Design a protein with these regions (language model features):
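Single conserved hydrophobic/aromatic residue that forms the stacking wall/gate
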Residues: 1-12
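Polyanion-binding surfaces on beta-sheet-dominated domains and ring/shell assemblies
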Residues: 13-19, 23-25, 30, 42, ...
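Glycine-rich, often proline-containing surface loops adjacent to acidic residues and nearby aromatics
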Residues: 33-41
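Charged, amphipathic alpha-helical linkers/stalks
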Residues: 115-170
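Short amphipathic alpha-helical segments that mediate assembly, nucleic-acid/protein binding
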Residues: 150, 161-165, 180-181, 201, ...
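C-terminal non-catalytic alpha-helical accessory regions
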Residues: 164, 170-185, 192-196
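C-terminal non-catalytic accessory extensions
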Residues: 189-231
Length: 231
């Protein structure tokens, strides 16, 4: 119920035992992504077709904002392009003498719409779910979009789990490790989209890992991912 009569406190009332809104792991907070509502206000006169054109531009810009942060889909191994309940509205000033005929990507209006949407969504995501470019610069953040049971990995590492996880948390933030992880995940994506042969991708991923990753914990983690998706 999204009735205006309901106050903020009513919206957040819940019963003990209800599904959590977030979980915390080692100082990192993970939230379920909510609805993205976009309102675009212009001070020019736009015909219905131009308004529709602007809607398309704004929708594409929303996807750009999500992809820039590498936000994962909650239902597949791909990147999110939005949520299932997103809304968008665009308004024009019908009294304006400045009438524009295009709001697509080639037009200045389209450029401004897209830039505003990207900036506002990026800021909203930062404030609402604390996802930023800095928080996404992590091996663990990049790997999160793949539906694997991390407990299965931990149960088979054969090392001191506490020390291993401590080392992993530190090594996962190194940019060189994030670069290696991103390269290997790109190969996995290529295979999942039938753009690359699995054997070729496996050999390349193994070579990238062997020649570019020096942290034992990251090596073990990525070996697990490679074997799960490319072997």
């Amino acid at each position: 119920d999204r009735s205006p009569s309901r106050g903020l406190g009513d919206v957040y009332k819940r019963q003990a035992g209800d599904s959590a809104s977030y979980y915390e792991e080692n100082g990192e907070f993970h939230f379920d992504v909510g609805t993205i509502n976009i309102i675009v206000l212009t001070n020019v006169s736009l015909e219905p077709g131009t308004l529709a054109n602007g809607l398309v531009t704004a929708t594409e810009a929303k996807t750009v904002a999500l992809n820039n942060l590498r936000i994962p889909s909650q239902f597949s191994n791909g990147f999110a392009t939005g949520t299932g309940t997103d809304g968008i509205a665009i308004f024009s000033n019908m009294e304006s003498k400045n009438r524009l005929s295009n709001a697509g990507k080639h037009s200045k209006l389209g450029e401004l719409i897209a830039k505003c949407v990207i900036e506002s969504i990026s800021e909203a995501i930062k404030r609402q779910v604390w996802i930023t470019k800095e928080s996404q610069c992590s091996d663990l953040a990049r790997l999160r979009r793949y539906d694997l049971d991390i407990n299965e990995f931990y149960s088979n590492i054969g090392d001191d789990k506490e020390e291993f996880i401590k080392s992993l948390q530190e090594a996962a933030r190194k940019q060189e490790n994030v670069a290696v992880t991103t390269s290997i995940l790109h190969l996995i994506d290529e295979v999942e989209n039938d753009l690359l042969d699995k054997k070729v991708a496996y050999n390349l991923a193994a070579s990238i890992l062997e020649n570019n990753c020096k942290d034992y914990c990251i090596q073990k983690l990525l070996e697990f991912w490679i074997n799960k998706f490319l072997s």
